[in-house]
């Protein structure tokens, strides 16, 4: 898959079949569209092209900027899409100027001039241009003028995708990680920089990597204890990164197994929300490195214990439960 970030220097596409969307999560619902895209391109010996936007359009056209929580960062989206057999991914800078161009200009100056498409596949509810006045009917009306065909994604599929995206975010936030993974079609993951903590875990016999998630838009799971796989700066590749359509991990190398705690550590101080990962049988210094965490299963809610001894006893049990599912 070729990735294009400069829309003023795009290649000349051959019989381009394009679809347009944010594709946050690149989940099972999205793959219905992606499969249709590839099928239509194959029919005409053409190239499949996904057009997506960065930043997320809601950040530009909505006042509720703080409400934007994304399943994938841009790099993660690229990574997952790269395993799905698409020819081209075009990342369009989404600006006020782009959002406010007349709908006719969007079709003429953007879709036609940049892509010269053979076919455009869009949802029945696709809106574009100033005040979102452009719609499927306008595109259908202008298609003969510019010589492209237009195919509609049915309402039930679009609605299913919207529901899936919402359900995935809700599942991640509310600890139903197994449902999120099922809807995604792969194991949910996130990355963070390993930073210094108070090193209490070492004293308890369970050293942890404290993670700082640097992308404020990236969704992370709700508070609780989880069974996880981990990868440090790409050294251990434990997941087929979007190349598998199911939610099972593949293990070409020995995976790093572990457990993760997200929350306020009520037994210790309860003042700051932290993400801590205990990687089993691992003793390298990794401060400043990037850890990727694949969240496999929610184990239990965060609990305040009466003593550190009680906490350690529960952590012992958490490890046992983690190993059962990893």
Which residues fall in each region the model found?
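Phosphate/ribose-recognition catalytic cores of enzymes acting on nucleotide-derived substrates
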Residues: 198-326
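Residue-level signal for inorganic ion chemistry
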Residues: 27, 81, 120, 180, ...
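N-terminal Rossmann-like or analogous alpha/beta NTP/dinucleotide-binding catalytic cores
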Residues: 59-124, 128-146
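N-terminal, positively charged, Ser/Thr/Ala/Gly-biased leader segments
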Residues: 2-9
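Glycine-rich, Lys/Arg-enriched anion-binding loops that position phosphate/diphosphate groups
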Residues: 143-234, 256-259
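N-terminal catalytic cores of NTP/NDP-binding nucleotidyl/phosphoryl-transfer enzymes
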Residues: 9-69, 73
């Amino acid at each position: 898959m070729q990735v294009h970030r400069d829309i003023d220097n795009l290649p000349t596409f051959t019989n381009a079949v394009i679809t347009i969307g944010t594709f946050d999560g690149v989940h099972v619902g999205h793959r219905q569209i992606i499969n249709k895209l590839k099928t239509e391109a194959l029919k005409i010996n053409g190239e499949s092209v996904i057009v997506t936007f960065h930043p997320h359009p809601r950040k530009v056209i909505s006042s509720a900027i703080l409400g934007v929580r994304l399943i994938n960062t841009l790099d993660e989206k690229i990574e997952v899409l790269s395993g799905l057999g698409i020819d081209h991914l075009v990342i369009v800078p989404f600006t006020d100027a782009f959002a406010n161009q007349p709908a006719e200009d969007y079709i003429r100056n953007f879709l036609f001039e940049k892509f010269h498409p053979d076919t455009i596949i869009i949802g029945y509810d696709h809106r574009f241009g100033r005040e979102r006045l452009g719609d499927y009917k306008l595109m259908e009306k202008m298609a003969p003028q510019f010589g492209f065909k237009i195919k509609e994604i049915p309402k039930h599929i679009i609605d299913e995708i919207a529901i899936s995206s919402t359900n995935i975010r809700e599942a991640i936030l509310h600890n139903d990680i197994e449902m999120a993974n099922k809807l995604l079609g792969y194991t949910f993951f996130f990355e963070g920089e390993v930073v210094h903590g108070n090193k209490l875990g070492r004293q308890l016999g369970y050293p942890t990597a404290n993670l700082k998630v640097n992308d404020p838009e990236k969704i992370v799971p709700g508070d609780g204890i989880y069974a996880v796989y981990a990868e440090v700066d790409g050294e251990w590749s434990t997941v087929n990164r979007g190349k598998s359509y199911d939610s099972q991990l593949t293990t070409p190398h020995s995976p790093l197994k572990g457990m993760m705690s997200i929350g306020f550590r009520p037994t210790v101080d309860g003042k700051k929300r932290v993400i801590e990962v205990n990687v089993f049988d691992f003793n390298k210094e990794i401060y400043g490195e990037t850890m990727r965490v694949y969240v496999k299963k929610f184990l239990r809610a965060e609990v305040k214990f009466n003593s550190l001894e009680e906490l350690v006893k529960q952590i012992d049990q958490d490890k046992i439960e983690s190993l059962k599912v990893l």
